[in-house]
C-alpha cells in the first residue's frame, strides 16, 4: 500500500510573506476611497490603491507593531522609500491621528523584543483574509 504524503506545513518565512502580503492588501483597501484612490498621509498625493504602499511608523523589524493597524497607513512610494517615510512628518501625522502618549508608547515599546509564533502568523493571515472579504462585499 503506497504511503500517503502528509501536506507540508509552510515554513515560517512563507507565513511571514503571506501575512505581509495580506495585511498590506488590507491596509491599502482600508485607506482607499470607493474609487480605489489612496491619499498619502505625508504628502497628500493621490495614487491608485494598487500603487500604494503599506507605510509602517515603527519599522517592520519590530514584530510587536508589524501587523498593528494603528502603526500602518497606505501611502506613496516616494514618501515610503525615497524619502524614507520622513520621520518628522510621519510623527506629526501619528500624533494628530492618535495622541502624543500613544505615539510615545509605540516608540518606547518598539525597543522590546517580541517574536510572533507560527500560530500567531496563521491567525493574522486568517483575520486579514476575512477583513479583505468584508471590504470586497462592501464595495461590490
Residue ranges and their predicted role:
Residues 1-26, 31, 46-47, 106-140:
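A boundary/linker detector
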Residues 7-12, 57-60, 76:
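Short, flexible active-site loops
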Residues 15, 64, 82:
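Conserved aromatic-histidine-acidic binding/catalytic patches
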Residues 20-23, 30-39, 68-72:
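Short metal-coordination and nucleic-acid-contact micro-motifs, chiefly zinc-binding Cys/His arrays
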Residues 39-71:
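Histidine-centered nuclease catalytic patch
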Residues 48, 72-99:
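Short Cys/His-centered divalent metal-binding micro-motifs
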Residues 60-72, 95-108:
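Short microdomains enriched in Cys/His and/or Lys/Arg
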Amino acid at each position: 500500500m503506497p504511503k500517503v504524503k502528509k501536506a507540508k506545513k509552510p515554513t515560517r518565512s512563507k507565513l511571514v510573506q503571506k501575512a505581509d502580503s495580506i495585511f498590506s492588501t488590507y491596509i491599502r483597501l482600508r485607506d482607499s476611497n470607493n474609487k480605489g484612490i489612496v491619499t498619502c498621509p505625508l504628502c497628500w498625493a493621490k495614487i491608485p490603491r494598487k500603487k500604494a504602499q503599506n507605510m509602517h511608523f515603527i519599522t517592520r523589524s519590530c514584530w510587536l507593531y508589524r501587523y498593528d493597524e494603528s502603526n500602518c497607513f497606505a501611502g506613496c512610494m516616494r514618501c515610503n522609500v525615497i524619502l524614507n517615510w520622513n520621520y518628522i512628518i510621519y510623527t506629526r501625522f501619528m500624533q494628530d491621528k492618535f495622541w502624543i502618549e500613544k505615539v510615545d508608547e509605540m516608540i518606547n515599546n518598539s525597543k522590546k523584543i517580541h517574536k510572533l509564533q507560527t500560530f500567531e502568523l496563521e491567525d493574522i493571515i486568517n483575520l486579514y483574509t476575512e477583513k479583505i472579504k468584508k471590504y470586497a462585499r462592501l464595495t461590490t
